[in-house]
Amino acid sequence: MKLLKSSLLLLLPFVTANPIPSEDKDIIPGRYIVTLKDGITQEDIEYHKSWVASVHRSNLAAATAAGRPRLETEGIRKFFQIHKMNAYSGAFDDQTAEDIRRNPYVKSVTPDRKVYLADTVVQENAGYNLGHMSSKGRHSFTYRYDSTAGEGIWAYVLDTGINVDHIEFEGRADSGYNAIKNVSNTDNFGHGSFTAGIIAAKTYGVAKKATVISAKAFDTGSSTYDYIFDAYNWVVKNITDSGRQKKSVVNMSISSAKYQPFDDAVDNAFEAGITTVVAAGNDQRDASNNTPASAANAITVASIRFDNGRSLFSNYGSVVDIFAPGERIVSCWIGGNNATRKADGTSVSSPHVAGLVAYLMAIEDLPDPAAVTKRVLDLSIPDLVRDPGEGSPNRIAYNGIQEMNETVIA
């Protein structure tokens, strides 16, 4: 969240030297995300769905009758309702897409596109990161934290799934939801297990007693907004239906080129009382060019090294809210119930702050996402980031333990 501002996807690879591919290459031909205007009724929505189905059938029939090549498209795929935002994904021929764009109920018709995870890089030496979170940004290999440790808090991980049987989760991991048909809930890629471990693993986690819930939208290093909207829609509904807004945080270590419909979804979740933490991206550029980093009401996290220098790969700029460790980090992996790996990336930085949010929610009464963000920023340590990048805030995440009773883990 950009506090005090007006207010496909690729998993973030754990670090990649490669920037996000060009927008044209990432567009999915014939696939769209359609957002509807604010204020329409449920009756309007049902009428619109029927209208789209009718227009789609008519256009396909007209193409056949005229002897034009007919692109077999399925029409509306999934419908999403995220607080006040109504949207749907669909596969349409060009004429139907244009007809939908002109419909008076429609706000936007945007081509679906790939979203990426951050690439994984294996490096030697790890372990400073948790000490960093409790030592005001200074070098330490001792992690100090309140013994509540995120207990009673739910952290939703929109990613590749979670290795829920990993011993580090101690039974506190749940498969949650899978947006990808004909693919198991299992984490086959590792990225989701790694980020979940930074949030809540007993050894590697910031909030060691929190529960992590998977919302699977990726099975490899890339996905599309069709799946990501579906998974995020489930997360928002699951949190709001259970009344857990003050006890839940969402982590998304993902990135694509700027995609306004999904930024709008994050902002609507914020209005519904949900805190979302996201990665700034690994493209060495202004994060305002990336989604969901550019969402006004996400907490956007950039990466620092062991020495508090901004990571060379990390995005930067005014949409960044805070920095957290993102290099030489060890966490949970796949391939066994005790597997681990080391990795770099803003994908790694984001769950440090998601874990911090879970940690703070367990010990303080934070009534809404604005209060959560303010508390995270108020606790942060200023002026230690070297070369934060043009427009970036100079703030490092800190858990505030020196102002609280503490438990010491050597």
UniProtKB/Swiss-Prot annotation:
Subcellular location per the Swiss-Prot or TrEMBL entry: Secreted
* Domain named Inhibitor I9: residues: 31-118
User: Where are the active-site residues found?
Assistant: 159, 191, 347
Q: Name one GO cellular component term.
A: extracellular region
Q: Where is the signal peptide?
A: 1-17
Keywords linked to the UniProt accession: Glycoprotein, Hydrolase, Protease, Secreted, Serine protease, Signal, Virulence, Zymogen
Glycosylation, residue list:
182, 238, 251, 338, 405
Q: Name one Pfam family in it.
A: Inhibitor_I9
Q: Does the keyword Kinase apply?
A: no
Could you say which EC number(s) this protein's record lists? 3.4.21.-
Q: Alphabetically, which GO biological process terms does the record hold? A: proteolysis
Residue ranges the record assigns to the propeptide: 18-118
The Gene Ontology terms for molecular function here are:
serine-type endopeptidase activity
Where is it predominantly found? secreted
Enzyme class label: hydrolase
Presence of keyword Hydrolase: yes
Limits of the Peptidase S8 domain = 127-410
What function does the entry list? Answer: Secreted subtilisin-like serine protease with keratinolytic activity that contributes to pathogenicity.
The family annotation for this protein states: Belongs to the peptidase S8 family.
- Know the name of this protein? Subtilisin-like protease CPC735_003880
